[in-house]
Amino acid sequence: MKQGSRSEGARGDIRGYIQKTGERNLYRIKKGLVPNMNVEGHMYVNDKLKHLIDDEIEMYQLNRNSTFLPAVVQIANVSTLPGIVKASIALPDVHAGYGFSIGNVAAFDMSNEKAIISPGGVGFDINCGVRLIRTNLFYEDIKDKQDELAQLLFNNIPVGVGSQGCILCNQDKLDEALCLGMDWCVKEGYAWVEDKLNCEDNGRSFYADSNYVSVRAKKRGITQMGTLGAGNHYAEIQIVDEIYDKRSAKLMGIEKKNQVCIMIHSGSRGLGHQIATDALIEMEKSMTKYKIDVIDKQLACTPIHSKEGQNYLKAMGSACNFAWINRSSMTFLARQTFAKIFNQSPDDLDMHVIYDISHNIAKMEDHLVDGKMKKLLVHRKGSTRAFPPFHPAVPLDYQYCGQPILIGGTMGTYSYVLTGTDKAMETTFGSTCHGAGRALSRNKSRNTLNYMDVLQKMKEENISIRVASPKLIMEEAPESYKNVSEVVNTCHEAGISNKCFRLKPVAVIKG
């Protein structure tokens, strides 16, 4: 297949290759949809969400000369990559992305010398993720201060595309930070020791080596530490709206409805984007060297154990550390904000991190494949780790309930906390959904939604909102996304994650 031809490959009526299985909410994408599939695709979607998948397919089939590829074709394309095992997996928030769809999980056998690593399987915002902080406050404590809290958070947390961070950082400090992750934050006084214990990988990637991060990437990152960014990134003040699993919620410090939490969704900013861009350029060159031919040039990749593959892992690990520092820095700012308004210390307010999780990452993990334990490189792009109770990677506090999974909703809608399951380990490489997933493009949202209508809806829901860029009001409106409750329910019914509790926003801060 000629590299660069994005609309070739899918054969006939795509829907003929999608088959419902006997498992709840699980479809097969059969081999043959595109040439040279090594494994089939697995897609988790319920009846209410499947029409969005069908809409993407119909748009593609009406205009095959377009550069647009629907998520189903992208899932099939990923299955052609060298070294992939079991299946290319689509989760219910899946939608078209760069090379890999967003909401895709793909794992590659590290014992296979041809197995690859691909920046498209991680995404440009490396270690984009979510952090949830609890408090001992309840809605009654904040309802008269809701607008004041929203404004002070907006003032304290730098937002927007060109925002600059509050953490002054020189080149030496940045290099140290990129290698140490949250350990650097603890050392510098921006995080508590216990914060990192309830963080995926303890907030530090040991792949990281800042020597493999370009000067340009460092230049973009040095001013952005502790910044929210724009797009779908946010900081929200939320209240617990529903508790489904009281035992697990209690382990997370959540015991009653209306308890106040803070959710932060952000990533590695310009540094991560530049690392991804640099890697894609290098990998496009290296594919000729390693005789790799991809069905779509956006799937640029290289063998995991090659020099280029190892260089990307080290740079990607550095971006992961930057993102954990970024969310930790904003946690520091959120704690300061609450301390000022309530005239109590963050410790007195019980502002502890419940968990921090990534949904754009590639990681070496052990998984059972065809009855054998194998070391795999698991790519999760727009998908979240979902490890079960008693897994060694799950923090001590959560050994009995499984790993907390933080699912951010859309502006003005619910967010969820889930827990990991054994079924996820068996079927999805210990993975589940990450959020709502876009239903409308940003351009379509701007053209079809009304700014004032969206604001009025937020007002009716008694949600305070602060946003740096007005166009984001339409782009990030709930109508632009899939129904997050349907996404979460699909995964719960399929058994790949369990619902624990639901959160409702009362204040939203966006770039």
UniProtKB/Swiss-Prot annotation:
GO molecular function annotations of the record: GTP binding; metal ion binding; RNA ligase (ATP) activity; RNA ligase (GTP) activity
EC top class named in words: ligase
Keyword ATP-binding on entry: no
Binding site for Mn(2+) 1: 125, 128, 233
Residues noted as binding Mn(2+) 2 in the record, renumbered to the chain: 128, 265, 359
GO cellular component, one term: tRNA-splicing ligase complex
SUPFAM superfamilies: Hypothetical protein PH1602
Active site: 434 (gmp-histidine intermediate)
Pfam families: RtcB
Cofactor details (free text): Binds 2 manganese ions per subunit.
Keywords noted in UniProt: GTP-binding, Ligase, Manganese, Metal-binding, Nucleotide-binding, tRNA processing
Further information: Ligation probably proceeds through 3 nucleotidyl transfer steps, with 2',3'-cyclic phosphate termini being hydrolyzed to 3'-P termini in a step that precedes 3'-P activation with GMP. In the first nucleotidyl transfer step, RTCB reacts with GTP to form a covalent RTCB-histidine-GMP intermediate with release of PPi; in the second step, the GMP moiety is transferred to the RNA 3'-P; in the third step, the 5'-OH from the opposite RNA strand attacks the activated 3'-P to form a 3',5'-phosphodiester bond and release GMP.
Function recorded in the entry: Catalytic subunit of the tRNA-splicing ligase complex that acts by directly joining spliced tRNA halves to mature-sized tRNAs by incorporating the precursor-derived splice junction phosphate into the mature tRNA as a canonical 3',5'-phosphodiester. May act as an RNA ligase with broad substrate specificity, and may function toward other RNAs.
Cited PANTHER family: RNA-SPLICING LIGASE RTCB HOMOLOG
Full protein name: RNA-splicing ligase RtcB homolog
Species per Swiss-Prot/TrEMBL record: Plasmodium knowlesi (strain H)
